[in-house]
Amino acid sequence: MKRTIISIAIAILAWGNAWGCTNLIVTRGASSDGSNMVTYAADSHTRYGFLNHLPAAKYPAGALRAIYEYGPERYLGQIPEAARTFNVVGNINEHQLIIGESTWGGLTDHIDPKGILDYGSLMYIALQRCTTAREAITLIAKLADEYGYASSGESISIADKQEAWILEIIAKRPEYNEKGENLNKGVVWVAARIPDGYISAHANAARITTIALNDPENYMYAEDLFEYVRRAGLYDGVPEEFSFADTFCPLDFSLLRGCEARVWAFFNKFGAEDMGRYLDFVRGDNPANRMPLYVKPARKLSLKDVADMMRDHYEGTEFDMTQDPGAGGHSLPYRWRPMGFEVDGEKYSQERAIATQQTGFWFVAQSRGWLPDPVGGVIWFGVDDAATSPLTPVYCCATEVSDHYAFGQGNMVQYSPISMFWLVNRVAQFCYLRYNQVGTEVRSVVDAHEMEMMERVAAADAMATAMSPRKAVKYLTRFSVEAADELFYKWKSLDEYLLVKYIDGNTKQQNPDGSFKTNGYNDFVPAKPMFPGYDKQFLDAIGRSEWGKRLKER
């Protein structure tokens, strides 16, 4: 059957102007502290990183909600507002419900240009109105059916205190009457629960294949799913063998290498089974050798494990971005866009890792069901590239956010000196110049900061749990804001320190206390700096090349 497909991965690999996101999911039985965890990297070359805050509110009967497309901010229409909405900080609400996503595009004829609700609006509406993952899945599907779905194919991570799910959704093929009205409004969708004790992920490719038809404990799906795919000419086999992912998001090289490989990296690092058996799949050589939707980890994962996985560049694998010629002389694990290139008529693509330079914001969110809701939900939030940015903890009950992370402090075309996004970007740009030197030091600062904050969060948990709910909310809001403010000033000092230490390709010598050594005659002329130069493999490559002949000393 001939089908057309729009693959977000193609754009990521070839042109680099599409959105590409990564979600990791860790169920409570797979985490070292018993929390459900969801990560999300909002990757886009035009996305500005800020911490979204939607305060709890009450609305009068008949109130309407204007819908603007997530990202472009294009007005789509309006829908009735709920009588009451919950507090939302980032992508977690006051009931510890967490939602993230990644876009996979899908069949080009399954996009409703007249839909009112895009995926971003559906996510945040669900966070404002729902308390559990199952409620959120049901609401998203119901609203998309009623008002039309304005986005392409999506995978949506949804976790609460007990469960973690993946929802995959795409618009039905539009059919118009003489008035231009879509008679086929609505969505096709499936959802799978990740079994407790397992980990999962998705990264711009649909991953749910077959589903158990009579297992509501573990699967949910559109009532008219099988009726629709038959009527649309997409599938005519038995329901038990129907694959959602293969039908709506057929795999190609770009999806395998640029998207599924990121999932493989997570499974390879922490999975109990040998993921080497799927190398031909993620290399793009054997699309039939699909990875499972979820795997059991070899050990339970800590918050730090999960955060650091978001900083992965395939280190230690055959896809290691620090090792190929594109890494240059400083083991740089980044490739500037466009990622596709051509040599002698052959097309090539660079690797696409979880950590990437164009991240707007990212997070690791925890739902800790053994704690009261104001205390249990924490979103560890960061802006820009995960590999060079620190996380700051924000409790789900917070009624305000730090000015340094708030909406309105700068944007992608306007610099703000008090914006954490711009400050972290300043540091990152410097890291990219000498990644194995500057980047290594920044990573050590990130690690020390996050380990300290985990201890401080544990202490704050204990303090807040002993308080009344009202006092706990006030205390945890203050804790969250002050922690973010402190981090901003810590990063400002780091930015200044790095410039002084690493200026002009040099590295200044330091005393045991961290101060810079001087020449011994005064306190303002430095000692002779160190010249760290380039990686040996880079110099070897130059020496053995045609250019090396020109540089050879005579």
Spans of model-derived segments:
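Positively charged n-region of N-terminal signal peptides that target proteins for export
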Residues: M1-T4
